[in-house]
Amino acid sequence: MSSYLALVIGAILGSSFRYFITLLNFTILGLPAATILVNIIGSALAGYFLNRFNGALYIFVYIGFFGSFTTLSSFNMELFSLVSDKSFVKALIYFSLNIFISFLFFYLFHMISIRFEN
């Protein structure tokens, strides 16, 4: 499979999964939860599969799928909306959940993958 084809197929799948989760249209504590959920799932999977792929498969999984599944642009748009509405506490919670929890899941699932490898 060519690198370009791997990228395109991964991006189609990643954006499709993201769109499906967005259609669930739910909130947690009044915050847009779809982006938080996508970032946590994407971070967990990216951490789990870290350094497992190369070549076209890496392009398919990391650049194509994860690149289109987890998007910082949606996060920034929703964070900006909260700040613009002067919902500073919600904005701080939203920022923290996306950044810290996503990183925590990335790290934890990477450690889990190492345990399974050994």
Predicted ranges, named:
Residues 1-118:
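Membrane-interface helix-loop junctions in multi-pass transporters/channels
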